[in-house]
């Protein structure tokens, strides 16, 4: 486990060393694992992690369904709403389907339309790890949407090096540090040897140099 003060020091240094911009930049961490065989599926990480302070940037969410779930999606101001007809149409429009799959981070789908989603969008969403979360009828999706807006998804596949967004330069270093702390604790909790499987951690802004944390 990394001490919070050390995380804060690395975040502050990364922000200070980054070229000054007139716009907000993302802040990311890159984690390099060791002594772990990622060819074994049981060792791979596939986690959605709620950040205590959000990402500081907009997270694209798509809701698929009809009726009440559509009404709730509109109330929650999600970025894209698709009905069954649109899903089927995208099945015959591969370029547009790829754009949808890459443009939105999270997908929610009414349980009743999941077979159509699997058939027509599965080939685009599956490889990206973005198959929709099934939503049973009468479920209030608004708290789910709010949670996802403040979450990041880590999916390593068979790689030992992976990166994730942890915040933005519009946030305070303390807020970003809290987010990093939450991510590292979650990652270490699913590794067989915990922090002993972590070779290094670097933090950087989009345009700035990397600063070693671990």
Swiss-Prot record:
The keyword Methyltransferase does not apply. Keywords: Repressor, Ribonucleoprotein, Ribosomal protein, RNA-binding, rRNA-binding, Translation regulation, tRNA-binding. Gene3D superfamilies: 3.30.190.20, 3.40.50.790. It holds the Pfam family Ribosomal_L1. One of its GO terms (molecular function) is structural constituent of ribosome. The keyword RNA-binding applies. InterPro entries: Ribosomal_uL1, Ribosomal_uL1-like, Ribosomal_uL1/biogenesis, Ribosomal_uL1_3-a/b-sand, Ribosomal_uL1_arc. One of its GO terms (biological process) is translation. GO terms for cellular component: large ribosomal subunit. PANTHER family: 54S RIBOSOMAL PROTEIN L1, MITOCHONDRIAL, LARGE RIBOSOMAL SUBUNIT PROTEIN UL1M. Binds directly to 23S rRNA. Probably involved in E site tRNA release. Part of the 50S ribosomal subunit. Belongs to the universal ribosomal protein uL1 family. NCBIfam families: PRK04203.1 (NF003244). This is Large ribosomal subunit protein uL1. It comes from Methanoregula boonei (strain DSM 21154 / JCM 14090 / 6A8).
């Amino acid at each position: 486990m990394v001490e919070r003060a050390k995380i804060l020091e690395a975040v502050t240094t990364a922000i200070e060393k980054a070229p000054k911009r007139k716009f907000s930049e993302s802040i990311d961490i890159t984690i390099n694992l060791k002594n772990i065989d990622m060819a074994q599926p049981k060792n791979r990480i596939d986690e959605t992690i709620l950040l205590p302070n959000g990402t500081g940037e907009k997270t694209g969410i798509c809701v698929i369904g009809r009726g009440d779930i559509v009404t709730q999606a509109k109330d929650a101001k999600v970025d894209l709403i698709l009905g069954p007809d649109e899903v089927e149409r995208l099945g015959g429009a591969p370029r547009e389907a790829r754009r949808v799959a890459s443009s939105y981070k999270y997908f929610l789908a009414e349980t009743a339309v999941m077979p159509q989603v699997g058939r027509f969008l599965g080939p685009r969403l599956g490889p990206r790890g973005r198959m929709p979360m099934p939503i049973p009828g009468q479920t209030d999706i608004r708290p789910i949407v709010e949670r996802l807006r403040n979450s990041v998804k880590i999916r390593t596949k068979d790689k030992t090096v992976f990166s994730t967004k942890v915040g933005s330069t519009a946030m305070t270093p303390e807020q970003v540090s809290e987010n990093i702390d939450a991510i590292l604790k979650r990652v270490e909790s699913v590794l067989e040897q915990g922090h002993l499987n972590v070779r290094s951690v670097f933090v950087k802004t989009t345009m700035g140099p990397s600063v070693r944390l671990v």
